[in-house]
Amino acid sequence: TLLEGLVWSDGAPVTSEDAKFTWEWVSDPAAGTTSGPAFANVADVEIVDERTFKVHLTDTDPAWYNIFGRGTSNGAPILPKHLMQDYMGEKAQSAPYNLNPVGTGPYKVAEFVPGDVVNFEINENYRFADKPFFKKVEYKGGGDAPAAARAVLQSGEVDYAINLQVEKAVLDSLLQSGSGELIVLPDGSVEHVIYNFADPNTEVDGAVSEPSTQHPYLSDKAVRQALALGLDRDTIVEQLYGQTADPTTNVIPVPDMFVSPNTSYSFDPNEAAGLLDEAGWTGSPRSKEGVEAKMLFQTTISPLRLKAQEIIKQTWDELGFDVELKSIDSSVFFSADAGNPDTWKRFSADVEMFAFNGRPFPIDLMSYWKSTPGGRYRSEVQRLVGPQPLPLAER
């Protein structure tokens, strides 16, 4: 049920029609939204009255509240139907709302210069009359993480910066100025490497990395284990991240109730080499039955990620892999453009590295490990997250 009297920042009322419309708009494949998968379990959004709606699910979902969420999930916030209804499907990309959104929060957009700055002013229609506390907020973009850190910790021209992907040596030097404070919170975001189980070099109906294909060497469990043993997590954290990160072998490091005690990989190149030899991958570059272990390893353009790539490449090269590095602008890599070959979802490489956002209740994140036709998975994972009816306690 929506709050009584809730209105958009342009003064229009927020209604159940907006919720139903959001489901229809986001779920349309032609719109190319990144939030579409979050609604895959929604069968219908039923309007009860102007402020009440029911979400009908096709299967039990303990994280149902994440559907209309944002920031802590892959869901989407409720959208204003009166501004978006003329921009369904392929028209979604051209909606004026994309550059001039309205919402129900304490601020509204006063100015947006893409790639540069967003200026916010107080939303006079905000539901709490005595908030917010700042008359305006300037959200500055562009530049890079080190520049953002200097603006807070050195020059003091900026009040606050978030998610600083800054190398340890640079951050330590800036902190010595005493102009700012570093606050580190365990948010559950994990920088991780993903192996492509499909073949990025074989086209199926004009597309690569199709589930119906099999990767020539990453389909071998021994190869994947060797690569994992060749990941020097401690060195990456000590040299690059410092106090802003902890090494982990879990996709979900927090909260404790979701942390697996059974996942562990030490850095052991000797064991990795032994696994490869035993599996028949020999030589330099390593090969087996005419297949060479040549690898394209992609990530975004970020000082930390590029240096982490170099550390990983060094060990993998020493193990006998032929590793080529590729870096992609983050606006391209994380794009929702279905026709873009360089997005993380298209996965036109053998290996890629990026971070999942943390979630307080990460059930929806675990859906990435659910089987799809042609996928590779553990049957137990599919059983627990799939549509089969299971007792709630077992789930």
Sequence positions of predicted segments:
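Primarily extracytoplasmic ectodomains and periplasmic/lumenal surface modules that are beta-strand-rich
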Residues: 7-8, 61-64, 247
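Surface-exposed binding/hinge segments that line
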Residues: 37-87, 111
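Contiguous mixed-secondary-structure segments that line small-molecule binding/active-site clefts
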Residues: 90-98, 253-254, 271-272
